[in-house]
Amino acid sequence: MPLLFLERFPWPSLRTYTGLSGLALLGTIVSAYRALSQPEDGSGEPEPLTAPLQPEALAPARLTAGGPRARDVAQYLLSDSLFVWVLVNTACCVLMLVAKLIQCIVFGPLRVSERQHLKDKFWNFIFYKFIFIFGVLNVQTVEEVVMWCLWFAGLVFLHLMVQLCKDRFEYLSFSPTTPMSSHGRVLSLLIAMLLSCCGLAVVCCVTGYTHGMHTLAFMAAESLLVTVRTAHVILRYVIHLWDLNHEGTWEGKGTYVYYTDFVMELALLSLDLMHHIHMLLFGNIWLSMASLVIFMQLRYLFHEVQRRIRRHKNYLRVVGNMEARFAVATPEELAVNNDDCAICWDSMQAARKLPCGHLFHNSCLRSWLEQDTSCPTCRMSLNIADGSRAREDHQGENLDENLVPVAAAEGRPRLNQHNHFFHFDGSRIASWLPSFSVEVMHTTNILGITQASNSQLNAMAHQIQEMFPQVPYHLVLQDLQMTRSVEITTDNILEGRIQVPFPTQRSDSLRPALNSPVERPSPDLEEGEASVQTERVPLDLSPRLEETLDFSEVELEPIEVEDFEARGSRFSKSADERQRMLVQRKDDLLQQARKRFLNKSSEDDGASERLLPSEGTSSDPVTLRRRMLAAAAERRLQRQRTT
């Protein structure tokens, strides 16, 4: 809203403002009375506006025995350049008191939205009329400024009252328990406003006859604007009251409401557009700040007219398609369904049937199809869009492709385009401010994709594995290296693009000692062969023994997960990541050294066992199991000590 700082200014209350205005008026009257009561010396003459009053005209009034009359005092106040603004302020104060009285009688306490609308309307009106007076008309005398200020004071009073009536009508029309007395008070005020607009037309004719055709055109346009707004609200109120008193459901209400809004809004926009064009041509202000403001307002009005015409064309298209494609439901179908309209929840005496079999009111379905081309109940597509709508849908699909992954031919998700759309709506601040949009497109592909840090990939992989623990870590990480997005990888898992192995595959790979046969060396010392022949002996362990060996699975699992984690590049930009990689390499080297040591010690133990003379014990399966368990326990203790 323009002049936003005025809202934050600590304005006085209406009571304080009224008291100050009364004191100012009383002071000016007393001053004028004293000036007229003094003997004629020329020092007390007021500063004239245009043509100063002759002293001979005021002398008879001063010489009367009863002193100056009220007419003489008023004439003196109007002729003074300072006292006249006190009279203008008094007129504004009277209008505010009348508005407050109307609020108490007709509306009562105002809602928050009504107060905000009144503030917006008032400050916008003040801003534009200030530009009109000093930028378009370029008035030179105080008399003209006073005349236009009084004229616009009456106009802003009518505009605010009409706006308040419109907001209250919209509130009362949606309230099911509104008494008729409330409707009667608001409608009576609207009729009084319409009669006041007729009085403004008479003032336009009288003033325009004396000041020229341009002044008449400006004043007539302003009065017509407020008259059209008042008539619009009255017509809407009449339609609503007729619907309330009408028995049953009035199917034609939507059509009457739509065409009333269309005609009145188009007439209002056309009048306002012509009024601003007249201001631009009359003022000859091609290179000024006022011309910029008028150009912005003209652009806004022109786009509003275009938008309203496009909406009307869409309405006609929807009505034509609805009447051509969807037949009226028969009484038998209404009796069989015996249901209420799913949009307005009212009983249906007449309805239209969609291809999916659902029934709706004619007006309800028309209002729905203006926004969406699907069934309100089952969301089945009705396919009634024409070529332009189809193109808009196609553009919307293309926009969705930038946000949603689409499967490529090889089954991998296609990389998306990250579009950033910024929109500035100037009409929310002021109707004359422009609205603009900026769209920044970042097209990503495999070659030019920005390499995300490995720590981010690992964090995303852990996040996905918390949601899908059955998916191996390395598969999640491989997909993240391609997509760089948690959402896309999640969609790939849900849609089956990532082949998840069976749960038994991991357990089999982690526990090879439990399922694979044991190779037992059987050296032949008598023949002196250097080769070692192996003999496969199936290893059948008891349940307790399997529980004892479960620690190997628990310890191998994090090691296997760590092997699949993405290690950062040796030339990483992050110092923390380089330090983490160094520590990780050091731990890997220590683990490899421990493994080599344990393998070497186990080989030495096996060689010493082969050299034992006791042949019976070496071939005993029970002894072999005991030795294996002892070796496994020893390795476990060594690992615990080293870690």
Curated annotation (Swiss-Prot):
Subcellular location, record wording: Endoplasmic reticulum membrane
Description of the deletion phenotype: Mice with a conditional deletion in the liver display improved hyperlipidemia and insulin resistance: mice show elevated energy expenditure and are resistant to diet-induced obesity and glucose intolerance. Increased stability of Hmgcr, Insig1 and Insig2 and suppression of the SREBP pathway and novo lipid biosynthesis.
Membrane topology reported for the UniProt record: Multi-pass membrane protein
Reactions it catalyzes: [E2 ubiquitin-conjugating enzyme]-S-ubiquitinyl-L-cysteine + [acceptor protein]-L-cysteine = [E2 ubiquitin-conjugating enzyme]-L-cysteine + [acceptor protein]-S-ubiquitinyl-L-cysteine
Source superkingdom: Eukaryota
Residue positions, PTM Phosphoserine: S516, S542
Cited Gene3D superfamilies: DNA helicase RuvA subunit, C-terminal domain, Zinc/RING finger domain, C3HC4 (zinc finger)
Membrane-spanning parts: 82-102, 122-142, 186-206, 215-235, 254-274, 276-296, 429-449
GO biological process: endoplasmic reticulum unfolded protein response; ERAD pathway; learning or memory; negative regulation of canonical Wnt signaling pathway; non-canonical NF-kappaB signal transduction; protein autoubiquitination; protein K27-linked ubiquitination; protein K48-linked ubiquitination
Residue ranges of the region described as VCP/p97-interacting motif (VIM): 622-640
Main EC class the enzyme belongs to: transferase
SMART domains found in the cross-reference section: CUE, RING
CC annotations in GO: dendrite; Derlin-1 retrotranslocation complex; endoplasmic reticulum; endoplasmic reticulum membrane; Golgi apparatus; growth cone; neuronal cell body; perinuclear region of cytoplasm
Occurrences of domain CUE (ranges): 456-498
Mapped zinc finger ranges (RING-type): 341-379
Pathway: Protein modification; protein ubiquitination
Positions of the UniProt region annotated as Disordered: 504-535, 598-624
Tissues of expression: Expressed in heart, brain, liver, lung, skeletal muscle, kidney and testis. Not detected in spleen.
GO MF entries: BAT3 complex binding; identical protein binding; nucleotide binding; protein-folding chaperone binding; protein-macromolecule adaptor activity; signaling receptor activity; ubiquitin binding; ubiquitin protein ligase activity
InterPro entries cross-referenced by the UniProt entry: AMFR_Ube2g2-bd, CUE, Znf_RING, Znf_RING/FYVE/PHD
Keyword Calcium recorded: no
Function: E3 ubiquitin-protein ligase that mediates the polyubiquitination of lysine and cysteine residues on target proteins, such as CD3D, CYP3A4, CFTR, INSIG1, SOAT2/ACAT2 and APOB for proteasomal degradation. Component of a VCP/p97-AMFR/gp78 complex that participates in the final step of endoplasmic reticulum-associated degradation (ERAD). The VCP/p97-AMFR/gp78 complex is involved in the sterol-accelerated ERAD degradation of HMGCR through binding to the HMGCR-INSIG1 complex at the ER membrane.
PANTHER family linked: E3 UBIQUITIN-PROTEIN LIGASE AMFR (PTHR15067:SF5), E3 UBIQUITIN-PROTEIN LIGASE RNF8 (PTHR15067)
Assembly description: Interacts with RNF5. Also forms an ERAD complex containing VCP/p97, NGLY1; PSMC1; SAKS1 and RAD23B required for coupling retrotranslocation, ubiquitination and deglycosylation. Interacts with DERL1. Interacts (through a region distinct from the RING finger) with UBE2G2/UBC7. Component of the VCP/p97-AMFR/gp78 complex that enhances VCP/p97 binding to polyubiquitinated proteins for their degradation by the endoplasmic reticulum-associated degradation (ERAD) pathway. Interacts (via the VIM) with VCP/p97.
Entry domain remark: The CUE domain is required for recognition of misfolded proteins such as mutant CFTR. The VCP/p97-interacting motif (VIM) is sufficient for binding VCP/p97 to form a complex capable of transferring VCP/p97 from the cytosol to microsomes.
Protein name (database record): E3 ubiquitin-protein ligase AMFR
Species in which this protein is naturally found: Mus musculus
